[in-house]
């Protein structure tokens, strides 16, 4: 009888584990579908193909010494926005909804993979989110985030943090909100003991360039030529002279500085 009872418990545990995996897979599928739908709805089918099929797109890897940060809360306070930490309790509380549904599904996925995040919220609606990944100090690159591996990082410090996928709802992208959100999230990470942040942006993403490099003064570490075909990516380091002429479209160079800031 005891043996039969043990076998029944084992079978029940196995069925529970399989069901849990199926739910996670279903959430991943839902996230991908919602993400594609949002992208196509906002920017058309061409934007989708641009994200999953491209050749030699320039990625700029950047770093920020978090000791250089200064408080800049006015843009968020003026827009009645606040910074919140995203964790399982926050998502499961039912107190907050996401302005863009695919970002909620992404949040579930990122938390499942051990990432941390911060939300930009007005009242109980999340209008922006940004994510980070912490690796233990290691000399084995296999323990690093896949982006860091792709960009040639071979070691890491426990005081460093990798930041990625900052998003602000289109209706909120004005008055320096995106840059202030990024700055506030970095201040929050500094308060946790991190001393340096790394990230990357695409050279053809002009708003990301102005938010990260111009307003928040992140420093360039290196540049890569990245090609992607669906799930497969390849990154090749660029020499500085190769990267320089690819960072800013020629049409933008003729726009006065004051007008660029309004992009």
Regions found by a protein language model. Give the residues of each.
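Conserved catalytic-core motifs of GNAT/GCN5-like acyltransferases
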Residues: 62, 219-233
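Conserved active-site alpha-helix within GNAT-family acetyltransferase domains
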Residues: 203-222
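Conserved acyl-donor/pantetheine-binding loop and adjacent beta-alpha core of acyl/acetyltransferases
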Residues: 109, 113, 121, 125-161
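Conserved acetyl-CoA-binding loop-helix of GNAT-fold acetyltransferases
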Residues: 165-168, 174-188
């Amino acid at each position: 009888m005891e043996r039969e009872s043990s076998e029944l418990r084992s079978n029940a545990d196995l069925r529970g584990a399989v069901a849990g995996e199926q739910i996670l897979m279903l959430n991943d599928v839902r996230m991908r579908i919602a993400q594609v739908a949002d992208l196509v709805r906002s920017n058309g089918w061409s934007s989708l193909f641009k994200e999953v099929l491209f050749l030699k797109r320039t990625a700029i890897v950047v770093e920020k010494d978090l000791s250089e940060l200064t408080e800049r809360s006015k843009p968020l306070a003026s827009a009645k926005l606040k910074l919140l930490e995203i964790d399982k309790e926050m998502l499961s509380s039912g107190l907050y909804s996401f302005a863009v549904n695919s970002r909620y599904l992404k949040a579930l996925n990122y938390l499942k993979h051990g990432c941390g995040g911060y939300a930009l919220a007005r009242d109980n609606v999340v209008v922006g989110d940004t994510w980070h990944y912490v690796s233990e100090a290691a000399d084995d690159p296999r323990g690093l985030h896949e982006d860091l591996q792709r960009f040639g990082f071979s070691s890491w410090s426990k005081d460093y943090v990798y930041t990625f996928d900052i998003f602000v709802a289109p209706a909120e992208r004005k008055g320096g909100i995106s840059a202030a959100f990024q700055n506030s999230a970095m201040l929050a990470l500094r308060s946790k003991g991190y001393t340096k942040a790394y990230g990357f942006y695409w050279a053809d993403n002009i708003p990301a360039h102005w938010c990260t490099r111009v307003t928040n003064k992140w420093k360039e570490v290196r540049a890569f030529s990245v090609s992607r075909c669906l799930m497969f990516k390849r990154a090749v380091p660029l020499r500085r002279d190769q990267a320089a002429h690819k960072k800013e479209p020629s049409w933008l160079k003729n726009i006065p500085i004051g007008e660029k800031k309004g992009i």
